[in-house]
UniProtKB/Swiss-Prot annotation:
PANTHER family: FRIZZLED AND SMOOTHENED-LIKE PROTEIN A, G-PROTEIN-COUPLED RECEPTOR GPCR FAMILY PROTEIN. Residues 270-277, 351-361, 425-448, 529-594 are cytoplasmic. This is Frizzled and smoothened-like protein A. It is a multi-pass membrane protein. The lineage of its organism: Eukaryota, Amoebozoa, Evosea, Eumycetozoa, Dictyostelia. The chain crosses the membrane at residues 249-269, 278-298, 330-350, 362-382, 404-424, 449-469, 508-528. Keywords: Disulfide bond, Glycoprotein, Membrane, Receptor, Signal, Transmembrane, Transmembrane helix. Disulfide bonds join 32-98, 41-91, 117-170. GO terms for cellular component: membrane. Residues 1-22 form the signal peptide. InterPro entries: Frizzled_dom, Frizzled_dom_sf, GPCR_Fz/Smo-like. Residues 23-248, 299-329, 383-403, 470-507 are extracellular.
Length: 594
C-alpha cells in the first residue's frame, strides 16, 4: 500500500486551518453579504442570506474555490467521513453566517462570524480520523475567543464602537441551531457532495473486506481511502509501458529460440560430454527458463498478467503470475551461478588444469539445489507478485529480493571478477614467457573470454540499477503521493506531471540486457567450430535417412560436376584444335614464303 495518509492529512490541515487562521477574531474590514453564487455548499449552510466576508480581497468565488480544493481529497478519506454532518461543518466554517451587531450610536453595524461548536469539530475529526493533526481547541490572539467555541464566544467590540460584552452562541452542526438566531437551513434539502468515485486514473473500490483486498493486491491510497492506485503505476505513459512489453516479447522470443538452439546442440546432439559442454548446457538451460517466463508475459496482449483487475497488482493467488515469477527466479539464479562457473572453467582451460568428473557433477547439483532454495523461500513467504515497475512478476520485497537474488549475484560477480583478473594475468604471462607463439592459445579462447566479460559488464549494470532504484524508493513513493494529491486537487490528471522514477532509457536498457544474454550465449557458444563438429558427428547427420538424402545430393552434385567437366574438356579440345590450326597455318605460310 502506498500510504499517503500523512501527506493527505497535512494538505487537509493546511487548507482547512490556513483558512481559519487567516481570519481575525474581530476584523474591522469584515462585512455581511447575501449569498450570490450557486455553491455545492448551499444545502448545508445555516443562513444563505448573510455570509461573513472577512476582508475586501475575499469573494464568495474564492471561498468556493477553497472548498472545492478541500473536498477534492474527501474521496480518499473513509466513507464514514463522507456524511452530511461533515459537509455542514466544512461549509459553515468557510461560508460562515454573518451576525451584524449594531454600534452603540446605531450609526452602522459590526460584522462578526458564527462559528461551529467544538463538539461538532471533535465529532468530525473522529469520523474522519483527523483528530491527531486538526485540533479543535485553538484560540485567536484574543485568548477568550475560540476558533471552535465550547458553547459561545464573548466579544469585546468597544474598540469598534460596539458593546463590550457580546455573547454569541456557536452553531451546533447536528441540530443546526445557534441560540435564538434564525437561518435559512432546510434539512431535507441536503444532498451528498462527494460522489463515491475517484478522479481518473485512480480507481474506486467499495470494499467489504479491506484486509483481504490488500492481500489480493489492491493498492489503496490510505488505510481508510476507497481510491486505488492504477496498475501499472503511471511512472511512464501508457505508450511507453507497452513499448517495454513489446521489447520483452520480441527479444524474449528471439532469445528463447536462440537458447533452444544451444540446448539442442549440446543436449540432444552431443555424444561426448565434458566439463565445458556441461557448463554450456546448464547455462543455456537456465537462460532458457528465464526466456520461458517471458513467453508467459507475451501470452497476454495487455498487462492483465500483472494487473488482473483495475487497481489490483497480481499476487501469490494469481497462478500465472506466480509461475512467471518462480520460473524467472530459478532461471536467473542458475544463470548467474553457472556464469561464474564458466568464468572459473575458462581460467582452468588457460591454465590447462582439469577436474575429476564427479566434481563437476557435484558442482552442478549444488548450483541447482541452491537455486531451488532461493526460489522456494519467497514462495514460502508469499512474496511473488507484481510491484510498481517492470513487466512481469517476481519477488516484491527488497529484503527477500536482496537475500534470494542480489546478494548471491554479488558473490558470483566477485568470483567472476577474480576469474577475469586471473585470466588477464595468465594472458599477460603467456605473452611475456612465450611471445608471439602463444597468441594461438589466446585466440582459441578469445570468444569465451569475450562472452564472460560481456555478461560481467551487463550484470554490473543490472546490479547497480537495482540498488540505485532501491536507494530512491522513498523518493519515488513520495512522487506518487505528490501526483495523487495533484490529481485529486485539480480533478484531472491532464495537468499533473507523471511521478518521476527511473528514466525511460535506463529502464529500457535494464529490460534489454536481461534478454540480450540469451542471444549472446547463442552467438558465442552455439556458433563455433565445436558446435559444428557436434552436428557433423551426431546421429541426426549420420542416420540412414540423412545419409540417403546426402548421397542423393552428392550424386546430383557429381552428375553436374561430370557434365561440367565434359563440357569443359570439349571446349578445351576445340580451343586446342583451333590453336593448332592457327599454328599450322602460320607455319605453312612461312614455308611458302621460304
Amino acid at each position: 500500500m502506498v500510504d499517503i495518509r500523512k501527506s493527505l492529512f497535512f494538505i487537509i490541515f493546511f487548507i482547512f486551518y490556513n483558512y481559519v487562521n487567516s481570519q481575525k477574531a474581530i476584523n474591522s474590514d469584515a462585512f455581511c453579504q447575501k449569498k450570490t453564487i450557486t455553491s455545492i455548499c448551499d444545502p448545508y449552510l445555516f443562513n444563505t442570506d448573510s455570509i461573513y466576508i472577512f476582508n475586501s480581497t475575499t469573494t464568495q468565488e474564492s471561498i468556493e474555490l477553497e472548498i472545492k480544493r478541500l473536498l477534492g481529497f474527501f474521496s480518499m478519506l473513509p466513507s464514514t467521513c463522507q456524511v452530511p454532518s461533515t459537509y455542514r461543518l466544512i461549509c459553515n466554517q468557510y461560508f460562515q453566517t454573518c451576525v451584524p451587531i449594531s454600534k452603540t450610536d446605531n450609526s452602522s453595524t459590526i460584522a462578526i462570524p458564527l462559528r461551529p461548536c467544538r463538539e461538532s469539530c471533535d465529532y468530525g475529526n473522529g469520523i474522519c480520523g483527523t483528530q491527531s493533526i486538526t485540533p479543535c481547541t485553538g484560540t485567536f490572539t484574543e485568548p477568550t475567543i475560540y476558533k471552535f467555541p465550547v458553547t459561545s464566544n464573548v466579544f469585546d467590540l468597544s474598540s469598534l464602537g460596539g458593546p463590550s460584552n457580546y455573547d454569541l452562541q456557536c452553531l451546533n452542526i447536528d441540530t443546526m441551531k445557534a441560540g435564538n438566531l434564525n437561518g435559512t437551513y432546510i434539512s431535507n434539502n441536503e444532498t451528498v457532495i462527494v460522489n463515491q468515485t475517484c478522479v481518473y486514473p485512480l480507481v474506486y473500490r467499495n470494499s467489504t473486506n479491506r484486509e483481504d483486498d490488500i492481500k489480493k493486491g489492491y493498492q489503496y491510497l490510505t488505510e481508510t481511502s476507497d481510491c486505488l492506485l492504477p496498475c501499472p503505476v503511471p511512472f511512464f505513459t501508457e505508450n511507453e509501458w507497452y513499448q517495454f512489453k513489446d521489447l520483452t516479447t520480441v527479444t524474449g522470443v528471439i532469445s528463447f529460440v536462440c537458447i533452444f538452439f544451444n540446448i539442442f546442440i549440446y543436449g540432444f546432439l552431443n555424444k561426448k560430454h565434458d566439463r565445458h559442454t556441461i557448463g554450456i548446457l546448464c547455462l543455456s538451460f537456465s537462460l532458457w527458463c528465464c526466456m520461458l517466463s517471458d513467453l508467459i508475459v507475451a501470452s497476454s496482449p495487455d498487462y492483465s498478467l500483472v494487473c488482473p483487475e483495475p487497481g489490483r497488482f497480481a499476487r501469490i493467488h494469481d497462478s500465472r503470475c506466480v509461475a512467471n515469477g518462480i520460473i524467472f527466479q530459478w532461471g536467473a539464479v542458475c544463470t548467474t551461478m553457472f556464469w561464474s562457473a564458466m568464468a572459473i572453467d575458462l581460467y582452468l582451460v588457460i591454465k590447462k588444469l582439469s577436474l575429476p568428473a564427479f566434481t563437476v557433477k557435484y558442482f552442478v547439483a549444488a548450483i541447482f539445489t541452491l537455486a531451488l532454495l532461493f526460489t522456494t523461500v519467497p514462495l514460502a513467504w508469499d512474496d511473488y507478485g507484481y510491484g510498481f515497475g517492470g513487466v512481469g512478476c517476481w519477488i516484491m520485497s527488497n529484503s527477500v529480493q536482496n537475500g534470494c537474488f542480489w546478494i548471491p549475484m554479488l558473490i558470483c560477480l566477485l568470483i567472476g571478477a577474480v576469474s577475469i583478473c586471473l585470466i588477464i594475468y595468465e594472458i599477460v604471462k603467456v605473452f611475456k614467457n612465450v611471445g608471439r607463439s602463444g597468441i594461438s592459445i589466446i585466440l582459441a579462447n578469445a570468444r569465451l573470454f569475450g562472452i564472460v566479460s560481456f555478461i560481467f559488464i551487463e550484470y554490473i549494470y543490472l546490479f547497480v540499477y537495482h540498488f540505485w532504484v532501491q536507494e530512491n524508493t522513498e523518493k519515488f513513493t513520495q512522487n506518487i503521493t505528490d501526483w495523487v494529491i495533484c490529481v485529486q486537487t485539480t480533478g484531472s490528471s491532464d495537468g499533473c506531471p507523471l511521478p518521476k522514477a527511473v528514466p525511460y532509457a535506463t529502464q529500457f536498457i535494464f529490460l534489454f540486457f536481461l534478454r540480450l544474454l540469451g542471444i549472446e550465449v547463442c552467438i558465442f557458444y552455439g556458433i563455433n567450430s565445436r558446435s559444428k563438429n557436434i552436428i557433423l558427428e551426431s546421429d541426426l547427420v549420420n542416420n540412414k535417412y540423412f545419409k540417403a538424402i546426402r548421397s542423393k545430393i552428392s550424386s546430383v552434385g557429381a552428375t553436374s560436376t561430370t557434365k561440367n567437366n565434359t563440357s569443359t574438356n570439349n571446349t578445351s579440345d576445340q580451343f586446342n584444335t583451333s590453336m593448332f590450326s592457327v599454328e599450322v597455318s602460320k607455319n605453312g605460310g612461312d614455308d611458302d614464303d621460304l
